[in-house]
Structure formats: C-alpha cells, structure tokens
Swiss-Prot record:
GO terms for cellular component: cytosolic small ribosomal subunit. One of the primary rRNA binding proteins, it binds specifically to the 5'-end of 16S ribosomal RNA. The gene is rpsQ. Belongs to the universal ribosomal protein uS17 family. Part of the 30S ribosomal subunit. The lineage of its organism: Bacteria, Pseudomonadati, Pseudomonadota, Gammaproteobacteria, Alteromonadales. The keyword Ribonucleoprotein applies. CDD domains: Ribosomal_uS17. This is Small ribosomal subunit protein uS17.
C-alpha cells in the first residue's frame, strides 16, 4: 500500500454547510473517438473544522479516514481568494 497522502486542488462552489464545503475539481479527458479534450468535473464534500473558506476560493485538500457518509477529505490550505470588487 502506498504511504503517499492524496492531495487535490479545486474551487469551492458552496460553503453553506456547517464545518463543510463542496469543491469542484476539473480534469480534462480525451474523447475516445473524436480526440477532443473534454472538461469533466468531480464534486467532493470536504471537512472544514474552523469554517475558514468562502465560495470561490481555490483550496488544497487531502484524503482522510471517512468523517461521514459523504466526507473523506479534509481542508489543508487556501491557495487563492477571489478578488473583491
């Protein structure tokens, strides 16, 4: 078994839950017939103990033991905050 801890980066799309938020992770896959690269999105629920993130932030998350039915990722750091107008 690998000792590496999986980490991912993505954009926060919802922070309306208590101690949790939803993140969208985009990836590009090649269409098997036409060869065009298509953007695919994965949505994950992430645990945030201190409620520090806001919608629009780009964050780093890491895999952890399951916290609930839908949460097995925990918040690590904010990489970028959206510019305020």
């Amino acid at each position: 078994m690998s000792d590496k801890i999986r980490t991912l980066q993505g954009r926060v799309i919802s922070d309306k839950m208590e101690k949790s938020f939803t993140i969208a992770i985009a990836r590009y896959v090649k269409h098997p017939i036409y060869g065009k690269f298509i953007r695919r999105t994965t949505k994950l629920h992430v645990h945030d103990e201190n409620n520090e993130v806001q919608a629009g932030d780009v964050v780093t998350i890491r895999e952890c033991a399951p916290i609930s039915k839908s949460k097995s990722w925990t918040f690590v750091a904010v990489i970028e905050r959206p510019k305020q107008a």
